[in-house]
Amino acid sequence: MKMLKLLWSLLAVAAVLPGVAKEYRVSLPEVAAALRQAGPGDRIVVEEGDYRDLELKWRGRGAEGAPLRIEAATPGGVKIGGSSSLRLAGQWLEIAGFDFRGGTAPKGAVVEFRCGQEVADDCRLTDCVIDGYNPVRRDMAYSYVILYGRRNRVDHCTFSGKLNLGVTLIVMLNEERSQQNFHRIDHNHFAPRPVYGSNGAETIRVGTSQQAYRSSNTLIEENLFERCDGEVEVVSIKSSDNIIRRNIFFESQGVLALRHGDRNLVEENIFIGNGVRNTGGIRIVNAGHRVVRNTLVGIVGERFFSALAVMNAVPNSLPNRYCLVEDVEIADNLFVDCSNIEFGTGKDLERTLAPERVVFERNTIVNRALTEPFIAVDRTDGFAFRDNKVALGAKCKLEGFKNVVPMLPSLPSEAEMRAGRGAARYRSQCGTQTPAPRTHVLRSGDDLPAAVERAGAGDTVVLADAGGDYPVSRAMTVRVPLTIRAAGEGARPVVRFVGEKGDNMVTIADGGELRIEGIAFSGVLEPGKALAKVGISTAENMIRPYDLFVDNCEFADFGEGGFFAIKGTQSTFAGRVEIRNSLFRNLSGDAIHYAAERDDKGRYNADDMLIENCSFFRILGLPINIYRGGSDESTAGPYVFVRRCNFEDCCNKERGSVMRLVGPQVLAVEGCNFSDSGRGGCSIRLDEATWEKVSIADCNLWNSGRILSMTGNAVKGPLCELEPAYVDPDNFDFTQRPGSPLAEKQIGTKK
């Protein structure tokens, strides 16, 4: 007992002696004041709670071996939301256990390693979560974390739910005091990020083209990049002397890009594609790099998304274009079932310089679907091939390659990938249970917008009366995944607009996904009422991507030129749009309009588009209008497929187009019939690059405009000029009569 009292006395004395670590228990807004008193080795413990609308500015100084630590009382127990951000500056600060969830950054990044003009050195952000910290619009750009200063560390953090423009984590080299920084970015989990649809959605960027030849000395290791699909560059290195090692890239639609800068080391990383579209590996630009001992499995991306892409260069290139690849070592790497290893990637009339002095040695390439180990886009006399092993679908006879039966690697499971990476406590909320789907049955005259607003995720709204009248005075706003359909196969229920103020008939808002079947949308102006703006459109401010499926619907009698049947608005993005078996007739505006991004910076409104077995009749605007302007190469979409559609008396004005397709990177127009359409201009106006995969085949052009292609190489199959023989055009049945020439050729709509 005496010994216990003595121990307590000694502890009490130690608590007030100089140099002994202290603990401060405070609320989140009180941290800044506590920092003015705290010193090396002290702990500031923040009470649990939900904190909102705080611009936190933390300055303090610890010491080597005795950092000043600011931590949540319970990891994850301090939740920071609303309009909040964190700025930290000083030296030897350690921030641990905080969760930023569901908020937005008021200005700049969510977390920055600087406060005003003062930067942070030797500071650490650990065991933190930033999840769903997005603005209201996806084109409002900011990052989750920006590193300034030197020798800072970001580790064991989880970064999730980023939907807006902007790099997730940036290493800045804009000043000398942030160069040669020796930052560490390790053991983090970069959780799924969907395709953004333009440049500027990288997961990590180190430097910029202006600092390409400055040494950063940043170490990126032991991170998990899981389905980071924002753009082609998952990790974008734009500086020199960095190390990227032992990371896992899991089903990420993009690459580790050595975009600018020299002498970077890429070693012992694992890339797992599992055959997912656009999964990529390593892209090389500039000089002096080493790419060694990496494992790439099931990577199927092409061109800039290849498993390995060694780029061609621009003569006398400016730093922000493509400098010569030279003096590069690519050794001891394993490629299993990877579809594209490319040398001379990007060769065109600008990028004309092939790589020089590249050593490709002791690599192993296994893919029984290939007959050659690599694709030579340009000459390869600048490569030295030595001691490589291959197991292909045919015997390889190239010098420097030996046919063998190799040992295949064992890959980590998803649980093993996540172990030790990210905040240990973090569990995505994606798996939370939702109520069982319900069906809402509506009769003619019922309040359809109100029913849609009441519906929960996965519900179905059924319009029960065949040919029934369903007037709407405001938009049906879809905020959850929802199906709206007719009850049966009789006459389509008719939705018509009777509002006092113009509005959409259906608006897909944040969180919404729509499947709509068997509905007719009438744009006829009701006496004393306003016109509908669009049949189906999107909210002006959206952050989340959405899907839209339209089947067996009719859009008719929209009588104003700016009023469209289906439209994606600016700064909204659809992952998938499918429009099948539908009729568009008597429209003054466009029928299908995904052309709102007009800044020519590579942005577009929908990634995958399928338009199949649809009829278009008497369309004054463009039946199909899809736009991706500019020459940006950081995305893979849009993918556009138009199959078995019929166009009768469409867009015959001077310089008009039935289809205007600007910048689709994958396009197939097949089995379509153009009749008395595009006479004043084009049936198809296509603006494509030489490397984009476009195909127009098996189409009929009867008394219709020509096909105008930028490259002149878009037509890949036969075209014909046969007069259509429709089943019942007076009742808008534009299928070909059985036995007619076009029916035999399977051109035009089908039953």
Model-derived features: positions:
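Beta-solenoid repeat scaffold
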Residues: 40-48, 52-79, 86-97, 118-123, ...
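C-terminal accessory segments
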Residues: 322, 402-426, 435, 462, ...
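Glycine- and acidic/polar-rich repeat regions and solenoidal domains
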Residues: 55-57, 82-87, 101-121, 130-400, ...
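Structural signal for short hydrophobic segments within the conserved structured cores
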Residues: 22-24, 78, 233, 438-440, ...
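C-terminal "tail" modules appended to repeat-scaffold proteins
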Residues: 375-383, 399-439, 444, 686-689
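Acidic Gly/Asp/Thr-rich repetitive segments characteristic of extracellular carbohydrate-active
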Residues: 21-53, 57, 432-469, 738-749
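Bacterial N-terminal signal peptides that target proteins for export
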Residues: 1-8
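Hydrophobic h-region of N-terminal signal peptides that target proteins for export
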Residues: 10-19
